[in-house]
Amino acid sequence: MKRQTIVTLDLEGVLVPEIWIAFADKTGIAELRRTTRDEPDYDVLMRGRLALLDAHGLKLPDIQDVIGTLAPLEGAKAFLGELRALTQVIILSDTFEEFAQPLMRQLGWPTLFCHHLDVDAAGRITDYRLRQPNQKQQAVAAFQSLNYQVLAAGDSFNDTTMLAQADTGFLFHAPEGIRTQFPQFRAFDRYEDLLAAFKACL
């Protein structure tokens, strides 16, 4: 009997712009342009980001103001809508609840598994809290334990364990360095091509 399917998608770079790159462009702090496409160690990346925010006196509302100006990538909402009409879709992201709400609203409120920030009364981000380490791979494994076939797509280093755990994983909008390092995953740049690849697995 054919198993039911869940699709898991990364958020930033796949459906919406990279939040930290947008914030870096707004503030002029070039070091904030580093993302999980550049740094495979997420703790190193986040500790560096928090140190930069402190050094420049920037707080959560400053980031939220920039997020409020962002929109999903062109074609993302239609792609997600068509995919959700075919199968269950869950967004697995290393973003934070405090960042995601405006973008989730624009995408039609898909289910999102992500992390949490510690923020003091003045709005300073004091720390970040992972819901669990390697949560993307862990979520896929949990869905598989419920007898789901899992299809996945992402663009960054932090997606590759999710893609490897999934029954089928694809790269989407991934930079050339990641495509070269992980040639086992088929890579796409257009939503219609990714949708066709998913449909072929359903």
Q: What residue spans do the PLM features occupy?
A:
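Substrate-recognition "cap/lid" segment bordering the active-site pocket of phosphatases
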Residues: 98-150, 181
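Acidic, Mg2+-coordinating phosphoryl-transfer loop and its flanking beta/alpha structural elements
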Residues: 89-94, 148-189
